[in-house]
């Protein structure tokens, strides 16, 4: 929806902020390190535009795609710590074809298990007083058996659990 969609999104974010709601923006962002850093600043941090510091997208949390590895995720983790924000990394998604890639085996482990190990590692540096960290995982409700395995791998990560209702 282009600029019109952006405007509506920002109005919705402003309204949610006024109501004191926690805002998760489902953007599934990531790229190579330098571009990931720019995405992270735009969604979680602050940017300088002609000497004026602003927060372009005042949300609490975004979803990210972990499949570019640590150099693509680290800028988001850094900004989580700096700006008291959070991320949810795609681990085992709820869509029917998720298994085409996420269920593939690497040795004796599924790719989603390997990704969960990365999420657990990235989360370690953000663990707060609650015992949980700022790096959570998207784990589909459509795969409850896998979710049990993933909880054991990521005991200190929040789970964002999509998959109830229409997919």
Each language-model region and where it sits:
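Surface-exposed amphipathic alpha-helices with a cationic face
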Residues: 13-17, 77-81, 120-124, 148-154
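N-terminal active-site wall of soluble small-molecule enzyme domains
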Residues: 1-55, 146
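General beta-strand structural signal in soluble alpha/beta enzymes
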Residues: 23-27, 61-64, 89, 139, ...
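A C-terminal functional module that forms or caps the active site or interfaces directly
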Residues: 141-167
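Short, well-ordered alpha-helical microsegments
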Residues: 9, 70-73, 144-148
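Residues that line or immediately flank small-molecule/substrate-binding pockets and catalytic motifs
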Residues: 1, 66, 141
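Conserved anion-binding
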Residues: 31-136
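Structural alpha-beta junctions
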Residues: 19-20, 124-126, 130, 156-160
